[in-house]
Amino acid sequence: MASSDSNAKLASQRLHSCAGGEESSGQCLEKQGAGARLRGWLAQLLPRADLPGARQKTPFNLNRYVLLLLYSIVVFTTGAVFYGWTALSAMIFKNDGFAYLCPKDASGVYVPDLRATQGKLYICDEQDAAVQKLYTMTFAVACLMSAGAGTLLDWLGPLWTELLGQLLNLVGWLFLAFSTVDRPLYYPALVFIGLGADASMLPTLCIRHLFPGSTGLIITILGSAASASFGIPLVLNTIVENHGVSVRDVSIGYCFFGPVLGVLVALLFMPRRGFALDDAGTIFREPDSGEGEGEAGPYALENGAQGGESQNAQETRRRKLLDPIVSSSFWTQFFSIRYFLIVLYFVVVSWATSYYQQAARRMFSEDVVSVIEVLLPLSFIPCILLGKVADVVGIIRVLFVMNTSGLLTYVFSFFKTDATGYLSACCFMVYMSLLTSQVYVYVEGTFSPNHFGKLIGISNLTGGLLSLVSNPLYENITVNRDNGDPLCIQIAMTALLCVQYVWIFILGFLKSGNSPLLNMDVKAKDDADAEKRADNAPGAEERTSAPSGSSSELAAVTVTPPQDSA
């Protein structure tokens, strides 16, 4: 693993050492042998090692793949564990959480007790509704903290943000460990767990700067680790069920190999100010690539170094060649139609996933629920695959796949059979695999990296707060009005997921060409002033001697041959 970068670079050099005639006839590759061809093929799969961002210094000079492994372990153990909600709620039920809401007779026996009469995990509907509220509350808090953590990440750097997130995780699980029937601490426990989720996840994304040209893949690798963390509650609940260990002991044990481990990794291997973009203060952006559309190519070079007026003006011109929205201000990007639509898309995703998690035991048998618990941690598999697909064909097509998975999740849930329940569970696994990562990849490839943390934080905040709508949908409509029948809300969610295709189509249209809606630039005057300064700067004539978008100018701002946008 330590030599993977050098091997990839060597293979790339050997492939490009052929003369044109030899390469076309295959003689050069035959001379190099099968080993060289294999290394060349692997070099095409691995992230590039020949760009400045891939060669920057790391803590203790660790190989970037080792660092990625450490970050992935932290995300796996302390990521969005509360998304494994069916298992986590089962632990709360086993600990008699909110049992005081259920009526008792004179002898202190619960009447009725749905555990005995219907084989449910909960005693009464009131207890079930109270526990299920915790999920949307935790999701909303996590998204709220995502906005704050994004700002902290931009201002304070990854180290302090990661430490804060892990300490919040630790406090939350300690509260959960010491919750009892007489002293229920579930609300503060889940609040702290929610606060720590994205606060400990977002700082690990700084490693994407070590893999220029593969940011989509790296984000989804970390996202896959977060998806695998859905299995942590399943493991803990299995220990409680099969080994007679109390919820308290299991929760305390988890604190050591979860949050405490995260603190140690942060102190040793997390940079204080993020990874330097590269020696010149530049980073390599990667707009979505795909087939049949004509935006500028990927890996465009954005210069963030301080310089004279002419250098800044030249940078303004270069950024405009790629995508005007990238060079605009935060507020311009925030009020753009692209950002509005991706946030709207995520709001519907949060509604669909939240209600499904809450009502799973109402829609399916316990056998299907058990399959959901097992499949959710395996969502890291489609997460990685879809991440690579996003790099190849673009995030818009991935959004289409994700929405189709969500739609089929609800379509299969209408049929009251275990077979269709298993199909629904499989679709839900795919739907959850890129729950927030799909937004991360879209924002990363569309907007300025200077505002990455704030934009994804605000999108998560909006989706999280509005996910609370599913609480009254579940409690007031499904449980109270419809006597536990989720059919009405299932139909509503299915309709919303159908409407989602409209937003996806518009986002694809905005990426497909120079639509007048592309930028929604309310700072047009500022852009015109910047362009004027560029034209009046010293040396402007030399810089503009080539036609706009010509090969000579594009060669200065691209690292690899351009590909089409998805």
Swiss-Prot record:
Glycans are attached at residue 476. The chain crosses the membrane at residues 65-85, 137-157, 158-178, 187-207, 216-236, 250-270, 334-354, 367-387, 392-412, 423-443, 455-475, 489-509. The keyword Transmembrane applies. It catalyses: L-lysine(in) = L-lysine(out); L-arginine(in) = L-arginine(out); L-methionine(in) = L-methionine(out); L-leucine(in) = L-leucine(out). Induction: Expression is not affected by changes in arginine or lysine concentrations in the environment. InterPro entries: MFS_trans_sf, SLC43A_AATransporter. It is found in: Cell membrane. Its main location: membrane. Disruption phenotype: Repeated attempts to generate a knockout failed. Conditional knockdown results in impaired parasite proliferation. Reduced uptake of lysine and arginine. One of its GO terms (cellular component) is membrane. It is a multi-pass membrane protein. Keywords: Amino-acid transport, Cell membrane, Glycoprotein, Membrane, Transmembrane, Transmembrane helix, Transport. Cationic and neutral amino acid transporter. Transports lysine with high affinity. Can transport arginine, methionine and leucine. Does not require inorganic ions, such as sodium, chloride, potassium, calcium or magnesium, for transport activity. Belongs to the SLC43A transporter (TC 2.A.1.44) family. This is Amino acid transporter 6-1.
